[in-house]
């Protein structure tokens, strides 16, 4: 029987939330530290299913990692060459582990088997594999063409130094290639073919690579130039920012409930694009205060939450939260340019449409957009399916702030990025029933 949690109709208390570490930064940092030529102590790393899969993989590849007090880790870099030249790596549904590891292992070469849960085998990886093959990699599909699982063999350097790659399905393909090619020691030019989505995630990658000693020239997000003789050298200590995508639920709660909520661990100078979510809330009625290590959202009681029609390409993960905020506007709202939702942990456009309809909303799906017309009052005690997608579970918790109880199936799917989410959320609320 499916486990579920019932959230009663609730009011929000003025609150401060210390965010867990960013998943995007955590897994990039682990891999870069493992490939460095020195030792790096990582602070505030996210503890979750996705980071566990990366840590397990690095262990199987022979990377020495010490677990210290207070969740700190000491990663002993391998100098850009994993000790174990063959391994069987199970990576769950962790795209932030699967894609970068695929590229790094393909560039280094060896005998590697990469696989995951069934959904991971439905998430495309062909654009990355095509680019890696141009760079001389030996990558074989073990199931359906263009999808995991994969076998990686020995790379043959064919001398090609200009690598085209598509970026319209997932920016993680470009991230993976950017992080892997410096391991060759050769100069490379990566050229985008067509549109590049989710550019802020590329900014995270480039800023982290720079912290690890590799400067990539970014020419208008069309051409990326990797210098010759590059190698990774880690900072002695690195602090992982709080998760800006995870912040979106609490910031949206502050807007919906017209109650101040502050999140700590991110701020005005965050390297994560999803901090822009707070700016989108500002446009539709929120008061936002920015600090160096916090963002605070509130709304005056007399000010309505305004409807929106938003191109959400710059905040694809946090934009899911806006689909719930739409119900507080009492008017039709639209999220556009969200085609990447289709190939995430689930088809998020279809899943969001299905579950919003259970609440009485009228929803129109398009290939890359969703139109949401809220009900007068959401249906009480709607049973929300979460599709093994952490963000579906966290988004729909906000329904309890709209005056009705809601039942969330499989709440433990939040373990992918935020294992304590429901405990934290409940601690911020008071039952209104």
Swiss-Prot record:
A GO MF label: 3-phosphoshikimate 1-carboxyvinyltransferase activity
Any single GO BP term: amino acid biosynthetic process
Enzyme Commission no: 2.5.1.19
Catalyzed reactions per annotation: 3-phosphoshikimate + phosphoenolpyruvate = 5-O-(1-carboxyvinyl)-3-phosphoshikimate + phosphate
Coiled-coil stretches: none
Subcellular localization(s) per the UniProt record: Cytoplasm
Keywords from the UniProt entry: Amino-acid biosynthesis, Aromatic amino acid biosynthesis, Cytoplasm, Transferase
Record's GO cellular component terms: cytoplasm
One Pfam family linked to the record: EPSP_synthase
Enzyme class: transferase
Assembly and interaction partners: Monomer.
General function of this protein: Catalyzes the transfer of the enolpyruvyl moiety of phosphoenolpyruvate (PEP) to the 5-hydroxyl of shikimate-3-phosphate (S3P) to produce enolpyruvyl shikimate-3-phosphate and inorganic phosphate.
Protein name: 3-phosphoshikimate 1-carboxyvinyltransferase
Organism annotation: Neisseria gonorrhoeae (strain NCCP11945)
Gene: aroA
